[in-house]
Amino acid sequence: MESPVVNEVAASLGGEKLEVFRKLNLLEQHRVESYKSWPFPETASCSISKMAEAGFYWTGTKRENDTATCFVCGKTLDGWEPEDDPWKEHVKHAPQCEFAKLSCPERNLTVSQFLEILGTVVKGSIEKTCKAFKSSFVRENEKRLDEFTRNQK
Amino acid sequence: MPRTKIPKNSKRNREVANREEKVRLYELKMDSRLISIDSLETKFLSAVDHQVKTLLGQVQKELANLKMPEVLRLFEELDRFSDFKASDQTQLLASMSMSGSAIEGHAPSATGSRNDEEDSSIGASGGSILAAHTGSLLRSTKAMRTPGPLHSARARRARRSRSACGDLNILHSAKPPSISSSSSSSRNSRSKLRTPMASRAKAFSADRTPLKQKQMRSGSPTTPPMAFLRYPKPGEVALSKYGSPMVAQVMPDKFANVNIPIRNGVLSLRPKKLDADEVESNLLENLDEDTLNQIKTLHENLQMIVNKASQAVFK
């Protein structure tokens, strides 16, 4: 049975004004909604709600449906067991993650802490985009260089 | 018979040199493009830091210490009258306009209309500030994803991000895998293995030297601008490359001098003070345009030598 506060939060999240957070899975409710197929029930230690609380959103497939990724550090974990504790696994495999260091669920976060995490997540997204673009840019131009060299000979 | 081989070799060498020069230019351009991408990334990262600090500074202490569930409920009350004081509302509205001006790369009209709605609402609360700043941060991220040269390629990828794997593209892990226990009795969740991408080795700076030398040589194909020449010693025979030996009878001067060829002879300048009366206009009329340009170049070279020599003497 969910508490009334959680229901109110879920209702408020239905509005369009919070959709800007969904793209980066910043809010716990958005992370819960990302789990399309999860092999463990709500009674397990690594249930959907507990996974989302620890910062994980679903990045699995039909074949590997137990894959989840942290929205802050980007660490992807699979091979979950029913008795795994998401927070402990998060700290174990990603000790440098700011969210794992905090070990604080969203309901206890202050606005200041949330803004710090927001900045970290946005900067991580920028760095990821730059890295992907640079690698594709270099790869395409190296193809052109190979074609040029082959044609000249 | 052996003479016919020389032109072919020289032609082949010229083609190889052209190809290598093009490859070198390509690498230079690639390096400059990658550097500009890095500077753009740094610019956006610092913009994010600035906006987060601005937001933390503007938000009131009571609001900053609120828990997230309460703030999320405030988001729902964006259209209602706020409990904050009038002065606080003015301060928050000012921070909204400041954040609007701080953003680079203007958002499209659809997003602009949403901002207008938020600005027009009376009694804006802290939640709208949070939403506006978050929207601006995310728009900054979105603006980066449409670089000029590969816009069409990125447009295709943008369509793929709508699929279930879209989140993977955004926050896919690229960090090395952490060590997990190998015992089979207690199996722990393991991280997916990621292959680190090999970084491309940059070209050495020594490779760029031939280009500079070639540029220098193209200016004067026969003789470099500065060369140490030796006069024949008294009685020494100077051999000519084009015929019989040539006996040099000119004795070397002890003083610096400049010889300027003119139509009917050579104008020799000595390191003495030259008056305007001594320079006859008839001699100067015989100078052609090429010689005049050469004299200007010599003047610049001499000035450079004088400056450097003066510095060396003073040290």
Swiss-Prot record, chain B:
Residues 178-188 have a biased composition (Low complexity). The lineage of its organism: Eukaryota, Metazoa, Ecdysozoa, Arthropoda, Hexapoda. Keywords: Cell cycle, Cell division, Centromere, Chromosome, Cytoplasm, Cytoskeleton, Mitosis, Nucleus, Phosphoprotein. Residues 153-162 have a biased composition (Basic residues). One of its GO terms (molecular function) is DNA binding. The modification Phosphothreonine is found at T146, T209. GO terms for cellular component: cell cortex; chromatin; chromosome passenger complex; chromosome, centromeric region; kinetochore; meiotic spindle midzone; nucleus; spindle midzone. It comes from Drosophila melanogaster (Fruit fly). It holds the Pfam family Borealin. Residues 103-126, 138-226 are annotated as: Disordered. Ubiquitously expressed in the early embryo. Expression is restricted to the ventral nerve cord and brain during later embryonic stages. The modification Phosphoserine is found at S152, S163, S205, S218, S220, S244. This is Borealin. GO terms for biological process: cell division; mitotic sister chromatid segregation; protein localization to spindle microtubule. Disruption phenotype: Flies show multiple mitotic defects, including multipolar spindles that result in large polyploid cells and often in delayed apoptosis. The developmental consequences of these defects include cell-autonomous and non-autonomous defects in cell-type specification and tissue architecture. Flies also display a drastic decrease in histone H3 'Ser-10' phosphorylation, suggesting that the CPC complex mediates phosphorylation of 'Ser-10' of histone H3. Component of the chromosomal passenger complex (CPC), a complex that acts as a key regulator of embryonic mitosis. The CPC complex has essential functions at the centromere for ensuring sister chromatid cohesion, recruitment of the CPC to kinetochores, and chromosome alignment and segregation. There is no function in meiotic histone phosphorylation or spindle formation. Belongs to the borealin family. InterPro entries: Borealin_C, Cell_div_borealin. It is found in: Nucleus; Chromosome, Centromere; Cytoplasm, Cytoskeleton, Spindle. Component of the CPC complex. The gene is borr.
